[in-house]
Amino acid sequence: MVAVHAVGVFCGSSVPGDPRYRDAARVLGDLIARRKVTLVYGGGSTGLMGELADAALARGGRVIGVIPAGLFAREVGHTGLTELREVTSMHERKKLMYDLSDAFVALPGGLGTLEELAEVATWSQLGLHSKPVVLLDVDGFWEPLVAQLDRMAGAGLLKPANRNLIQRTRSADEALDVIAAARPAGRKKWITAEER
């Protein structure tokens, strides 16, 4: 089992039209706090980011936000967090969130969320970490991505073991249970000539 003290959550800073996404963010934030796990996220106070952080804070949870200085005003940096760390770039934000987190959950979001998810999954594929990476699939939001991952694996462009680096869950409870039950993977880092 993986010792989980902090979970990094990727999600949108926009306000979605579907209230189920907001509800899922609130439920996840609340559950992370109830399980006495630190929430690490992008530091915004709007959209799903704000819902997530506010729910964790309302439950008395520890919340660390990581936000680039240039986005502080645009994403309306959350000033009520346990800790808000300003960084100089998006890359530094992702690296610090990675360093602070023992696992990752992706809620619905836009291109930034997709990019953060892809980067931590790629780092796992390269053998740089074995931290769990989980999709919280709210009402089928991530179905097209799951289908694309399956298509890439079926086409031989993604090894089956690497396809399974991103796990799909359908509730906050399931996401955190999958993370808690995860075992560090002892994977090969590279494809051999025989496997080509």
Would you name each region that the model predicts?
Residues 1-100, 138-178, 182-196:
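A cross-family phosphate/adenosyl-ligand binding-site feature
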Residues 92-127, 134, 185-191:
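Active-site/ligand-binding-proximal alpha/beta "capping" segment
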Residues 107-108, 132-136, 163-166:
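Flexible, glycine/proline-enriched loop segments at strand-loop-helix junctions
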Residues 110-112, 126-128, 139-141, 172-173:
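Short acidic/polar capping segments at secondary-structure boundaries
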